Structures are given as structure tokens and as C-alpha cells.
């Protein structure tokens, strides 16, 4: 049985950079839910858009993100540019 694939985009500087201390727990939750998770930390403005547009077509079943409203905005903007629309999840930082 193949596992569903998730791209998890996160901003390591969001929320007073506390995501780093919770990252493994979040990935563990997704893994237990049946996902093979690829974690992608953003480094600069626009990285979320670029990651979604370049990495998701035909490969991932879902995109999740964690960060502030800018991270969520970038992921949704990237998804709107893709022909195939995937479910998007959000974990506030």
C-alpha cells in the first residue's frame, strides 16, 4: 500500500521561531495519519509560492504549511497557480 505524500512548508522564523521545537512532533502526527512527509523550510519571501508551483504537480497529495499569514498566503497563491488543486492544511505558528 503506498502512502500519501505531503509537502510540508514551514517558516522557521515565524511565531518567535518556536516551530523548530515542535517540528518533529508535527511531522510525527502527519506520518501516523498515513503521510510520507517532505519538510521544506522557507528561506526568503516567495519561497512558499515557488515550492508549491515547482514541487507539487503530479507528486504530492496534499500541501500543509506552518507559519504566519504570509506563509499561508504564499502556499494558497502557489496552489492557485497550479492546474491541479490539492488540499491545503495550515498549522498556525
Task: Give the location of each predicted region.
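Small-residue-rich beta-alpha loop regions that form the catalytic core of phosphotransfer
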Residues: 2-93
Amino acid at each position: 500500500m503506498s502512502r500519501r505524500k505531503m509537502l510540508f512548508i514551514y517558516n522557521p522564523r515565524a511565531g518567535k521561531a518556536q516551530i523548530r521545537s515542535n517540528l518533529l512532533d508535527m511531522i510525527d502526527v502527519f506520518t501516523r495519519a498515513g503521510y510520507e512527509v517532505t519538510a521544506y523550510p522557507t528561506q526568503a519571501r516567495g519561497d512558499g509560492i515557488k515550492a508549491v508551483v515547482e514541487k507539487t504537480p503530479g507528486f504530492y497529495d496534499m500541501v500543509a504549511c506552518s507559519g504566519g499569514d504570509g506563509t499561508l498566503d504564499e502556499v494558497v497563491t502557489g496552489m492557485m497557480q497550479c492546474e491541479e488543486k490539492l488540499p491545503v492544511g495550515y498549522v498556525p505558528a
